[in-house]
């Protein structure tokens, strides 16, 4: 089971640079505010919930607004405003992929196709599960040419947020394939999928990708430490050594 954004797709690279300023703009101020500490608090909230549905980040932000004596909006309203701002940021990327002006490889984490080809060649069933709304995940997976790997096995966030979680997808995968957790491989850059995979006995490959410098082969140290902290078995910056990674996964 793959996560999507930051694990395969870079179309939404820079999304924290949209969410964080929005939160800073909308958070009520208090007398003893220190802008640096407020920013650090909000960023920690955002990244701690990375991998869960976007609505959970909005629910946490609504709590912060209330804590400061503000009148919080419905978290869904915050989510819709965030998605509106993010769509402005990524619109040119989506349009350039749709028109053919950009090639999918420009917006795929380095080595993604090689890794997917290696796993597919072994006959493994590949699933995609994302905290991004499902229609966007399906749109962007197709733009990146990933549909042939995942088919209909693509899952994303729903407006009824209780009807989707990566834990639920994992449970469904195990049930439908009649396998135990030790047959599950989870690959992602968010702590949620790593933790959920480990909780059922799966193997977890964490992707501490530096999305802004794709192909540099450098770790995002914040991600690396956080993902190791929740039990990742392997941490990679990208998939430049896809064949070697698969050999390690299967115990060669």
Give a label for each model feature.
Residues 1-2, 38, 43, 47-50, ...:
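Non-catalytic pre-domain segments flanking phosphatase-related domains
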Residues 44-106, 110-121:
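A metal-dependent, Asp-based hydrolase signature
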